[in-house]
Design a protein with these regions (language model features):
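Glycine-rich phosphate-binding loops of NTPases
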Residues: 1-12
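A cross-family structural signal marking well-folded subdomains
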Residues: 20, 24, 29, 45, ...
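Flexible loop/turn segments at secondary-structure boundaries
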Residues: 32-36, 47, 63, 282, ...
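Segments forming glycine/polar-rich beta-alpha architectures that bind adenosine-containing cofactors
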Residues: 42-43, 302
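Conserved small/polar residues in nucleotide/adenosyl-binding loops
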Residues: 304-306
Length: 306
């Protein structure tokens, strides 16, 4: 093996020394009446690095003195196998931010603990874990759109995933959950996701890509909750006030005057041009994976271009 940044391989003696001198092992023995999950939680105060997900898992299982094994096997383990540790933490934050747009990802454990403090019995705790699993399956589809069954929704999810921003995650998960509960169908979901995609693209072309984007989309998530037609509600919300959802006329003007080559992120500019190219439906599509933007022409518009 090689040490980080080292070109020479480590010797067996160096590996042995690192393990013997640098590795600490903690052994905890529990009795019949001990709560292993409570003991695990307390380890966070002894210098061991526990994630927000670790703490939340153990908080939940502390509330399951008689059903922990069944809930772990049937609900938590499938969730844990579905998502990585980082994805799990994000899921728990996405769940919290639906109700509190200001909650930070460092506050996941405390926030979820407050949210669940009124749970009365093990059946209610089990229901929470079951709900997390349902949300986890939706989040998994968001991250891996190829798993989505509906073609139109799959296409829109893939577009948002290609944009590579987490700012759309809260509202997308909310919309996905609304469909899973039967509040909206796949056509309505696809339409809402199209508005979301259009909002991202229009802001970039109009030159206002980063201005308050995260705050706006978190507020939109709260605004459309409970509304019968979340797609129309989303469009109304994004089109109101100073949210920079550029109109068609504004986009036409921006295309002629805005410095596209220097607007937003390079990856997003390339993506927009790629989507335009793909919209023509060429019988011989060009492989654009390795393409780069060298020039945006013409640099000066004349009447012939307009």
């Amino acid at each position: 093996p090689y040490a980080d940044g080292e070109e020479e391989p480590l010797t067996l003696a160096e590996v042995e020394s690192a393990v013997v001198a640098g590795l600490s092992i903690v052994s905890v023995t529990t009795g019949e009446n001990d709560n292993a999950h409570r003991i695990f939680e307390s380890l966070n105060n002894t210098g061991l690095k526990l994630t927000q997900g670790d703490l939340l898992r153990n908080y939940l299982f502390m509330q399951l003195p008689t059903r922990a094994d069944e809930v772990y096997t049937t609900l938590w383990l499938p969730l844990q196998n579905l998502l990585s540790n980082e994805e799990l933490e994000t899921l728990f934050w996405l769940d919290l931010v639906q109700q509190d747009p200001k909650v930070r990802q460092t506050e996941i454990y405390a926030g979820q603990q407050r949210r669940m403090r009124d749970l009365q019995d093990e059946s209610q705790v089990r229901a929470e874990v079951e709900r997390f699993l349902a949300l986890g399956r939706l989040y998994d589809v968001m991250l891996r759109p190829e798993k989505e069954k509906d073609a139109a929704v799959r296409f829109r999810l893939a577009r948002l995933r290609a944009w590579r921003t987490t700012t759309t995650f809260p509202i997308t998960l909310h919309l996905m959950e609304r469909r899973s509960l039967g509040d909206i169908d796949s056509d309505e979901l696809a339409r809402a996701l199209l508005y979301l995609e259009s909002y991202l693209v229009r802001r970039l072309v109009f030159g206002r890509y980063s201005d308050g984007l995260n705050t706006t989309l978190l507020a939109a998530t709260a605004d459309i909750q409970g509304q019968d037609d979340p797609a129309d509600a989303l469009q109304r919300f994004l089109s109101s006030g100073r949210k920079h959802f550029a109109s068609d006329d504004q986009i036409r003007q921006a295309v002629m005057t805005a410095p596209f080559y220097t607007t937003g992120r390079a990856a997003h500019r390339k993506l927009i041009l790629r989507w335009i190219e793909e919209s023509y439906g060429s019988k011989e599509p060009v492989d654009l994976d390795s393409a780069t933007i060298e020039h945006v022409m013409p640099q000066t518009l004349s009447l012939i271009h307009i």
